């Protein structure tokens, strides 16, 4: 079994699960997942986790995500993107003043609550919201805490006088679980206008950049796909690591506690024979297992 991550540049037209399914076949193992869904129309960085690395998703997701895209002012759809049905249109006579757009962008900076859209993979009562949305149903959802570190226009906007619409390129840096589609619709609401997402690309996630990702087709066509795997030992570089000897290893591989470590930090990556085998956290004077990754494979 392979353990580690693969940085995939997801093309438009595929769901995140489609990519996972293809890589399960390529690597011939079931234990394959990802750290954050991308909608079918969205391109960019999809971090695929293999084997024991699936246990590290929570740690990987702690890093921010960055997107670049284009939004439309003057148009609104039921899916908040161009895949849906138009639900509202408002003809703009002229482009919105830059200072008004900046004020609207800036108003989202910081922490806030965001209501997940009906067209999303969030589960309520065992069903995905998008399954209910496709039936025309709208149900009550719980808002989620999000944080927006950056949300601003990039370059000049384009105004189409014939359509009465304005197209704005933007960049957004956000916490996990933030829906950019919803952010855009809310941005339009701040201006008193319908708005929807035209295109979107994820350029950073979990501490990695799309510049270092691999085109999906290249991975699928490769005779040696394992060369694209970033091994477990290179993951979570900001966490301190400690290499144990054979005595401590006998305790660790059975989930045992450790009294003391030469480094007084927590959490800590535990290595044995140069392999990343566990994450321990200090509790009540002892180092206790938080994530067990015991493996001898790739």
From Swiss-Prot:
Record keyword tRNA processing present: yes
Annotated GO MF terms: RNA binding; tRNA pseudouridine(55) synthase activity
One of the Pfam families matching this protein, by short name: TruB_C_2
Gene3D superfamilies reported for this sequence: Pseudouridine synthase
Domain of life: Bacteria
This enzyme's EC code(s): 5.4.99.25
Source organism per UniProt: Oenococcus oeni (strain ATCC BAA-331 / PSU-1)
Family: Belongs to the pseudouridine synthase TruB family. Type 1 subfamily.
Name of this chain's protein: tRNA pseudouridine synthase B
Gene expressing this chain: truB
GO biological process terms, semicolon-separated: mRNA pseudouridine synthesis; tRNA pseudouridine synthesis
This protein's UniProt keywords: Isomerase, tRNA processing
Active site: 39
């Amino acid at each position: 079994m392979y353990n580690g991550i693969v940085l995939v540049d997801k093309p438009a037209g595929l769901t995140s699960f489609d990519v996972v399914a293809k890589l399960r076949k390529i690597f011939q193992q079931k234990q394959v997942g990802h750290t954050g869904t991308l909608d079918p129309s969205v391109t960019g960085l999809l971090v695929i986790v293999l084997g024991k690395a699936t246990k590290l998703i929570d740690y990987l997701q702690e890093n921010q995500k960055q997107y670049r895209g284009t939004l439309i002012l003057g148009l609104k759809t039921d899916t908040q993107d161009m895949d849906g049905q138009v639900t509202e249109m408002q003809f703009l006579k002229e482009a919105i003043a830059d200072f008004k757009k900046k004020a609207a962008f800036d108003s989202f900076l910081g922490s806030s609550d965001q209501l997940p859209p009906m067209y999303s993979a969030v589960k309520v009562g065992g069903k995905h919201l998008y399954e209910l949305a496709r039936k025309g149903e709208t149900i009550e959802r719980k808002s989620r805490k999000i944080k927006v570190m950056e949300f601003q226009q990039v370059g000049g906007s384009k105004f189409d006088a014939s359509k009465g619409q304005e197209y704005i390129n933007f960049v957004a840096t956000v916490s996990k679980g933030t829906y950019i589609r919803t952010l855009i619709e809310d941005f339009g609401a701040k201006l008193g206008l319908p708005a929807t997402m035209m295109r979107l690309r994820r350029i950073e996630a979990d501490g990695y950049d799309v510049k270092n990702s691999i085109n999906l087709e290249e991975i699928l066509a490769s005779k040696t796909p394992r060369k694209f795997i970033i091994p477990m030992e290179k993951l979570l570089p900001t966490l301190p690591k400690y290499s144990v000897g054979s005595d401590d290893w006998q305790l660790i591989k059975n989930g045992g506690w450790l009294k003391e470590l030469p480094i007084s930090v927590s959490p800590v990556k535990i290595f044995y024979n140069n392999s990343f085998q566990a994450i321990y956290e200090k509790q009540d004077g002892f180092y206790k297992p938080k994530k067990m990754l015991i493996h001898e494979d790739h």
